[in-house]
Curated annotation (Swiss-Prot):
Swiss-Prot/TrEMBL catalytic activity: (S)-malate = fumarate + H2O
InterPro entries: Fum_hydII, Fumarase/histidase_N, Fumarase_C_C, Fumarate_lyase_CS, Fumarate_lyase_fam, Fumarate_lyase_N, L-Aspartase-like
Annotated active site: H188, S318
Pfam families in the cross-refs: FumaraseC_C (PF10415), Lyase_1 (PF00206)
Site (Important for catalytic activity): E331
Quaternary assembly: Homotetramer.
Identification of the protein by name: Fumarate hydratase class II
NCBIfam families attached to this UniProt entry: fumC_II, PRK12273.1
Species name: Escherichia coli O6:H1 (strain CFT073 / ATCC 700928 / UPEC)
Metabolic or biological pathway: Carbohydrate metabolism; tricarboxylic acid cycle; (S)-malate from fumarate: step 1/1
A GO molecular-function descriptor: fumarate hydratase activity
Annotated positions binding substrate: 98-100, 126, 129-132, 139-141, 187, 319, 324-326
Family indicated by similarity: Belongs to the class-II fumarase/aspartase family. Fumarase subfamily.
GO biological process: fumarate metabolic process; malate metabolic process; tricarboxylic acid cycle
Chain's gene name: fumC
């Protein structure tokens, strides 16, 4: 039994594994780009299949493709979407910057499979042509950016945004639950005036709410599709109604608000929509890193750290120190946030480096974009499930640190003035006294006045957690 078959393209014949659906151009890419291990993301492959499915339907409706061929292409695309042919898409991210080889990989797989569905023999009877039929009314230059936007929008809507909302809700519930717990604040890593634990956490909630708004603001641009621009944005070799119809078809089959890009030249020449959207993801990463750092500092200890909150003990933390438990969810979250920030640099460089009518950094851009979405979505889910939901206050420790703080002296500013209040704090710190003892020793106020004016619960202001 032959292990290879001969396939040909405009450059001639080449041997292809007999059991594979791909053709000559895919095989050439496999042989010429043996670079690292990163493959085209499955979600991008499925977005390409969605794009080809929609194009086949519209080409049929416009009388440009026979019902027989269009139906076979759609059936083959549905098989790809069902995951039946995932191993037919082996190409590396590091290939042509337009994604042409992955577009042809999809064209060849769908053409060969559609030909089989119509009774043809793989690689011998080409009843459906990869370029003339599967790629009809298309160019890699508009297909690949379209698939990028489809994959990106679906990932943001289905993966990232739900997890962001869940984590925000968890922290909002914690903020309300801890609204009455007065604790010492900290600025510059030094003691500051009091606030409630609920107020502190409400800041985290507001950060995430703003992140959600920033991400949602970026979605309409990502929903604009390049399909119909063909080679350079002019729409050469397309029907006048094709671009609008194919965007409408993709919107229907994905239940997402896709529209045809109003300017195809921008859609082909730039990655601006994904640059902007990933900027919002970088902002989310910055917020999550701050939150995770706050959590692990507040939970530090258990006896020699801040220790104002407890977090779940999920696994042993040391191979040498018995009983040690570490804030591992915080560490995982901060690491992936660093990766997202690195991805942002790569995406910015790729987005800035397009020339004339086409950006040729697209595979790298979408690889990093989808990785960031996956990291943030998975990271938030894990952090929420294994850490955030289990945050609990250590009231005794909170009260101890609150009562030991010298910054409670700030409450005296309006009664005896800043200079005298500062003198009290310095004396207490230098001589190891309580604030009250230092104040009475200096004779600036009576014990009754001190007790009446220095009350932490009255120093947290009227700003409620959440607004």
């Amino acid at each position: 039994m032959n292990t290879v078959r001969s396939e040909k393209d405009s450059m001639g014949a080449i041997d292809v594994p007999a059991d594979k659906l791909w053709g000559a151009q895919t095989q050439r890419s496999l042989e010429h780009f043996r670079i690292s291990t990163e493959k085209m993301p499955t979600s991008l492959i499925h977005a390409l299949a969605l794009t080809k499915r929609a194009a086949a339907k519209v080409n049929e409706d416009l009388g440009l493709l026979s019902e027989e061929k269009a139906s076979a292409i759609r059936q083959a695309a549905d098989e790809v979407l069902a995951g039946q042919h995932d191993d037919e898409f082996p190409l590396a991210i590091w290939q042509t910057g337009s994604g042409t080889q992955s577009n042809m990989n999809m064209n060849e797989v769908l053409a060969n499979r559609a030909s089989e569905l119509l009774g043809g023999v793989r690689g011998m009877e080409r009843k459906v042509h990869p370029n003339d039929d599967v790629n009809k009314s298309q160019s890699s230059n508009d297909v690949f950016p379209t698939a990028m936007h489809v994959a990106a929008l679906l990932a943001l809507r289905k993966q990232l945004i739900p997890q962001l909302k869940t984590l925000t809700q968890t922290l909002s519930e914690k903020s309300r639950a801890f609204a009455d717990i007065v604790k010492i604040g900290r600025t510059h890593l030094q003691d500051a005036t009091p606030l409630t634990l609920g107020q502190e956490i409400s800041g985290w909630v507001a950060m995430l709410e703003h992140n959600l708004k920033h991400i949602e603001y970026s979605l309409p641009h990502v929903a604009e599709l390049a399909l119909g621009g063909t080679a350079v944005g002019t729409g050469l070799n397309t029907h006048p109604e094709y671009a609008r119809r194919v965007a409408d078809e993709l919107a229907v089959i994905t239940c997402a608000p896709f529209v045809t890009a109003p300017n195809k030249f921008e859609a082909l020449a730039t990655c601006d929509a994904l640059v902007q959207a990933h900027g919002a993801l970088k902002g989310l990463a910055a917020s999550l890193m701050k939150i995770a750092n706050d959590v692990r500092w507040l939970a530090s200890g258990p006896r020699c750290g801040i220790g104002e909150i407890s977090i779940p003990e999920n696994e042993p933390g040391s191979s040498i120190m018995p009983g040690k438990v570490n804030p591992t969810q915080c560490e995982a979250l901060t690491m992936l946030c660093c990766q997202v920030m690195g991805n942002d640099v790569a995406i910015n460089m790729g987005g800035a480096s397009g020339n004339f009518e086409l950006n040729v950094f697209r595979p790298m851009v979408i690889h990093n974009f989808l990785q960031s979405v996956r990291l943030l979505a998975d990271g938030m889910e894990s952090f929420n499930k294994h850490c955030a939901v289990g945050i609990e206050p250590n009231r005794e420790r909170i009260n101890q640190l609150l009562n030991e703080s010298l910054m409670l002296v700030t409450a005296l500013n309006t009664h005896i003035g800043y200079d005298k209040a500062a003198e009290i704090a310095k004396k207490a710190h230098k001589e190891g006294l309580t604030l009250k003892a230092a104040a009475l020793a200096l004779g600036y106020l009576s014990e009754a006045e001190f007790d009446r004016w220095v009350r932490p619960e009255q120093m947290v202001g009227s700003m409620k957690a959440g607004g």
